[in-house]
Amino acid sequence: MATTILIVAAEAFPLAKTGGLGDAITGMARALIQRGVPATILLPAYRGVAKQLDSAHEVARLEDLPGGDARLLAGVCPTSELPFLLLENDALYDRAGLYVDEDGQEHPDNGLRYAALSHAAMRIARGLPGLPRPDVVHAHDWHAALAPMLIREAGIDDVKSVLTIHNLAFQGQFPLEDAAAFGIPPACRGEHATVAWNKLNFMKAGIGYADRVTTVSHTYAREILTPDFGCGLDGLLRERAPDLMGIPNGIDTVLWDPSRDRHLGSLQYHSGDLANKRLCKTVLQREFGLLQDPNATLVVMGSRLTEQKMADVAAEALPRVLEAYPDMQVAILGQGDRRLEGALKALAVQYPQRCATRIGYNEAGAHRLHAGGDILLHGSRFEPFGLTPLYAMRYGTVPIGSRVGGMADTIEDPGADTPLTAMAFANGLLFDGDHVDAMANALSRAMHLRKHPMLWRAMQRNAMSTDFSWQRAVGAYEELLASLVSREDAAQEQGEALSQRHGQARAQAQGKAIDAATPAAEPARNRRTRQARGSMMPV
């Protein structure tokens, strides 16, 4: 019988997305379903989201959740063809912005909003009329990280929990006095459970209570065990190390495919013929107001403009390389720290028709950026996985990335000290640290490689042919989920056998005949529950 999964998250493309989390949730769910694993996504009913589902309808009412009563809606997203459960409470979710308002300020009740989401997951795990129970609740990031604790404290022993850490830097920290409003049991309001640095910490609760903890790359799984990358939770993570594993993300290779990308219109292309990629560069140059020069090397950046993403380093490194290579251009798409936005926008004044920065993000623009670029610059002080370099590689845009987290796992670079011919086996370039010199040297190295067309073409082919699909990635999740359920089944069978032996012994002592094939009543009830959970969540 297939293991049924309830995926609990704050984002899922295309219904709600601010970054890579939304892409990862959708890609994972689709791949699991394609492999025969029933999976449903539980998501807040943000403004306008319910209208995007086909035949959205109420399946349950949830009373006394944090933030008030809510409805549970079910439906299918027509574009992704994925089943969703939406937690509807307009007082919590019907507003502009997922996490921040129109002025970029965090919603002051974010703790309440996502505590409600975790409580809804626990209620589903416990059982709601007409709604099959999942075998595993898979919580993602701090927004859903209370769910494992709530499931454990509710005594729901036959539903297992997994927490996936997409970014440990965001932990969901809130005042201690909010614990009651968040529905955190009194027994869990201490340093042993949910409190760190005199604040409630949702991520700490998830790490401590989940049956398994995963993160999104092998390198990041090792990094977060250290003080440099553990964001203060490395001690707890080291305690949970036997239950911690890195499972690399995948990408949606249908959505990110230059041969059928609707955002490219008639300029779609494939690895065997890159003629249209050159035309995509012309389109991008025109869009950003750059000189339309087919021989220019166009470096693109598409990310949050923050210190984590080394936007501060890029603002200093790019002018050095622009001065050294007059044929280099830069196109930047992103938003973030206003100071860093200004520093990058200033490059357009210093280098007119060679540099341009567009503040904001839109999906179509991101696709055109990867299609039109020659090189992706993606520095990062820490990077749990790094989806953007993989998108770039799909489009034959060679990435330059920091040697951290997932990029250390996915970008293959023999190194600057190897013979030039060794780069024929590379799919990108890596640099170490967050120094301006390191980034500038990596850019210079890429500009030098561009002068060797056959070598560069080999790197493009390598990048475009590397398999980063969710079908490759999801097998490890499937094995993990199945092992949790099989372990529960084994424990249940052992309990049934023990109960049966005890029953037989008691009957024999009383001189009664016992049919050895008849199990005790309590295990039988457990078996019926298991059978009832064998199908997909209703939609």
Name the predicted role of every residue range.
Residues 1-505, 512-539:
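Catalytic cores of nucleotide-sugar-dependent glycosyltransferases that transfer UDP/GDP/TDP-activated
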